[in-house]
């Protein structure tokens, strides 16, 4: 049984990922593994000779010549949790085919001092990311003569992720936000603001939901934007979260709408009009919104839950920004398998994947 992915646990490690680069968007284009070179030493292999690491949060530079992503090294067998590798930020230069860990080039910052995820480029060779380093919060504590410990989330389970920026070489790290829960998936908008997903699960604003916020790149101007009273807008009243925002060419925002936990990583691509609405049923001026005005599904016939649909399931997606209104998506074809041992079929076909039909989706034997 697959352990569900939990959006409230961004530090989760799911070994088995590899980052590939295709030379062009065609089925027969050459595919190159650009991440495994980071772990070329045999010491990274497990007892079965497997190289099991994890990759997430891919983004590109403005000129398309560099890639940023987060990567976590293989687990150290028999090591305590505090001695395990953390999520680190890596950069791949497409022109030179070189891979580097951002903090490897610095003298004052250790890569393993915190989990670093969701990196993206800022103008001027700076990098925006979210991290458990909490550099400013630690500095304040030290100035007060206290231990510079990183804050835990309100459940006291894991260290809280907050927004940070740094130079391209990993120097001059600055903490932007101080949420007791997690601040995730920051992006720079065309208006110069930073848009991100905030888990509001502490204090007076607590609603145990992930909502959209904005902030200036210098840490000023924190502002709530959307979602606080819209978490029941999923299929069949599912409690959904607004994750991984992206700016569209028309100025609207696209998000991945999904429940906190998902066994399939499935999400509903959703377009939101932040200029005029603060919730699915509420305009900025306080008037009621007609259904479909504030938020609209980008792809019809898919849900925000793990439930199979005839149109399959969508995971990650990104707009192409070429005027075509197209998206690059990860998509899983709808498939079912027989589950009823009394079904009238060859026993050899029991449990084998089959293409979906409406009849099979409605059947109790699949």
Predicted segments, located by residue:
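Short, conserved, GDST-rich strand-edge loop motifs in beta-rich repeat architectures
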Residues: 1-14, 70-87, 129-158, 196-210, ...
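Beta-propeller domains
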Residues: 2-49, 73-97, 151-154
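Beta-rich catalytic cores
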Residues: 15, 54-56, 63, 85, ...
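Multi-bladed beta-propeller domains
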Residues: 26-53, 95-114, 167-181, 219-240, ...
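Residue-level detector of Asp-centered blade-edge/turn motifs that repeat once per structural unit
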Residues: 62-63, 122-124, 189-191, 248-250, ...
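Conserved core beta-strand positions within WD40 beta-propeller blades
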Residues: 66, 126-127, 193-194, 252, ...
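Asp-box/WD-like beta-propeller blade repeats and closely related beta-sheet repeat scaffolds
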Residues: 75, 80-162, 171-184
């Amino acid at each position: 049984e697959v352990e569900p992915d939990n959006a409230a646990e961004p530090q989760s490690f799911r070994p088995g990922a590899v980052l590939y680069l295709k030379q062009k968007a065609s089925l027969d284009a050459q595919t190159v593994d650009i991440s495994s070179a980071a772990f070329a030493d045999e010491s990274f292999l497990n007892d079965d000779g497997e190289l099991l690491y994890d990759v997430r949060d891919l983004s590109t530079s403005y000129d398309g010549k560099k890639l940023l992503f987060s990567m976590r090294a293989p687990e150290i067998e028999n090591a305590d949790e505090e001695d395990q590798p953390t999520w680190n930020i890596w950069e791949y230069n497409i022109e030179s085919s070189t891979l580097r860990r951002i903090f490897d080039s610095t003298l004052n910052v250790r890569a393993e001092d915190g989990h670093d995820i969701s990196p993206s480029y800022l103008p001027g060779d700076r990098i925006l990311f979210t991290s458990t380093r909490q550099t400013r919060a630690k500095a304040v504590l030290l100035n007060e003569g206290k231990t510079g410990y990183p804050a835990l989330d309100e459940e006291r389970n894991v260290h809280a992720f907050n927004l940070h920026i740094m130079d391209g070489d990993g120097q001059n790290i600055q903490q932007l936000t101080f949420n007791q829960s997690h601040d995730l998936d920051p992006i720079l908008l065309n208006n110069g603001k930073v848009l991100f997903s905030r888990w509001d699960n502490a204090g007076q604003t607590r609603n145990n939901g992930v909502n959209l916020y904005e902030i200036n790149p210098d840490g000023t101007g924190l502002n709530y934007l959307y979602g606080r009273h819209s978490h029941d807008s999923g299929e069949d009243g599912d409690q959904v979260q607004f994750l991984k925002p992206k700016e569209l060419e028309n100025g609207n925002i696209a998000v991945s709408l999904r429940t906190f936990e998902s066994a399939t990583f499935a999400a509903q691509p959703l377009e939101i009009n932040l200029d005029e609405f603060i919730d699915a049923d509420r305009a900025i001026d306080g008037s009621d919104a007609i259904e479909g005005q504030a938020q609209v599904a980008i792809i019809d016939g898919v849900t925000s839950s793990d439930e199979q649909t005839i149109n399959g399931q969508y995971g990650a997606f990104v707009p192409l920004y070429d005027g075509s209104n197209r998206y690059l998506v990860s998509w899983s074809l709808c498939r079912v398998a027989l589950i009823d041992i009394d079904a009238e079929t060859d026993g050899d076909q029991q449990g084998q994947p089959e293409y979906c039909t409406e009849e099979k989706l409605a059947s109790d034997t699949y």
